Every structure is written in structure tokens, then in C-alpha cells.
Regions:
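Residues that define the transmembrane beta-barrel architecture of outer-membrane proteins
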Residues: 32-34, 54-58, 86-90, 114, ...
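Detector for outer-membrane/organellar transmembrane beta-barrel domains
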Residues: 89-91, 95-97, 101-153
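Short glycine/proline- and aromatic-enriched beta-strand/turn motifs that initiate or cap beta-hairpins
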Residues: 21-80
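Outer-membrane beta-barrel "beta-signal"
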Residues: 166-171, 175-177, 188-199
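Cleavable N-terminal export/targeting peptides
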Residues: 1-32
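Repeated loop/turn-to-beta-strand initiation elements of outer-membrane beta-barrel proteins
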Residues: 34, 68-74, 101-106, 140-150, ...
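Membrane-embedded beta-strand positions of outer-membrane beta-barrel proteins
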Residues: 36-38, 62, 72-74, 94, ...
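Transmembrane beta-strands of outer-membrane beta-barrel pores
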Residues: 40-46, 66-68, 76-82, 98, ...
């Protein structure tokens, strides 16, 4: 017949695997480049020949993983600036990610960009511009639900412009998240909110 000590040892032996497993950290979800996103942005813009003007707009964007490291990217944005200026911007390109460690990536993108400006006076004459964009960013999942990202972007569309970007994202579920972002450039400062579906 087993005594109390033997029973106690058996209970401890049975609990050890459970306790060890509970102490091991839960792996964070991997960073995904398969997503569709809708964002709203507003900010101050400086156009050549004008004082600073305010504006806001919507952007629909998406990314799709082609391989483990490569992804395709596309976006369309429509912005309304005061003084009755309407700006449509298309972007299409490809990106490459390099994992620094688990849940920390650096990635870059090369983009072809088309921008159409429709407005009164001198803006009507600058209706269509094509150019290139370069992005370099670091992306990090800091917890199960929180993600941060920052980097630099250079656009050469009509005029050349370099911007610093920073954003934070909260993951409500594995598929749905919301974020905020800020852009600081020589002629544009903007703030935005977004909703993203990851697939």
C-alpha cells in the first residue's frame, strides 16, 4: 500500500510537465505580408507656388507574399486638398524582407507611382506625373497583440521628397488589426488611422 509520501511524489511527477510547459513563453505570431488595408489620413501639404494647405484622403492597399521573402504591393489613394485640389495616386511594386530574428524584419520596396492632380489654375496643367519610390523599414512584433514599424521613404514623382515614417498596430485577432501612423517629410506632415485584414 502506498503511503502519503509515495502519493505526493506521484502527484509532483504528474504536475512537473504541466508546470514546465506553462513557464515556456508562447511563440509570437509570425509577421505576415498577406493583407488588405484601408486607411484614412489627414495632414498639411506644401505644393510649389502655394502656402501650406490642409487635406485628407483614403488609401486602399494590399500586399501578397510571392515567396517566403518576396512580396508584391499595390495601393490607390484619393486625397482632397482645400482650394479644390483632387489628387489620385497609384503605386505598384515589389518588396523583399530580411528577418533579423524571430518577429523582427527589415524590408525594402521599389514602387512605380502615378499621380494625377486635378485643380484650378496652375494645378490643372500638372495633371499627370510618373515616378519611382523607395522604402526601407524595420518591422517588429513586440507582443502577442502589439506591433511597431518605422523607416524611411523616398519618392521621385514630379518633385523629389524623402520622409520618415512610424506606426503602431494592435491585433484584435489573428486576422484583424488597427493601426496609427505618422509621416514627416519636407513638404508633407500627416497622421493616419487604418484597419487591416491579414490572410
Amino acid at each position: 500500500m502506498m503511503n502519503g509520501v509515495s502519493i505526493g511524489l506521484l502527484v509532483v511527477a504528474a504536475l512537473v510537465p504541466t508546470l514546465v510547459q506553462a513557464q515556456q513563453p508562447t511563440p509570437l505570431p509570425e509577421l505576415s505580408y498577406n493583407y488588405a488595408e484601408l486607411s484614412y489620413d489627414e495632414g498639411d501639404f506644401e505644393l510649389e507656388g502655394s502656402d501650406g494647405i490642409d487635406g485628407d484622403g483614403l488609401t486602399l492597399s494590399g500586399s501578397f507574399e510571392l515567396t517566403e521573402d518576396w512580396h508584391a504591393y499595390a495601393s490607390y489613394s484619393n486625397s482632397d486638398l482645400d482650394s479644390s485640389i483632387d489628387v489620385d495616386t497609384w503605386a505598384l511594386g515589389a518588396g523583399y524582407r530580411y528577418p533579423l530574428q524571430d518577429n523582427v524584419d527589415i524590408y525594402g520596396r521599389v514602387l512605380y507611382i502615378n499621380r494625377e492632380v486635378d485643380g484650378p489654375g496652375r494645378f490643372a496643367a500638372e495633371a499627370d506625373d510618373d515616378g519611382l519610390g523607395l522604402q526601407a523599414r524595420i518591422r517588429m512584433r513586440v507582443s502577442e497583440v502589439f506591433e511597431v514599424e518605422g523607416g524611411i521613404q523616398h519618392l521621385d514623382v514630379g518633385d523629389s521628397d524623402t520622409a520618415l515614417q512610424a506606426s503602431a498596430r494592435y491585433h484584435f485577432t489573428r486576422n484583424f488589426s488597427a493601426g496609427i501612423g505618422m509621416t514627416f517629410a519636407g513638404d508633407t506632415d500627416s497622421f493616419g488611422i487604418n484597419a487591416r485584414y491579414t490572410f
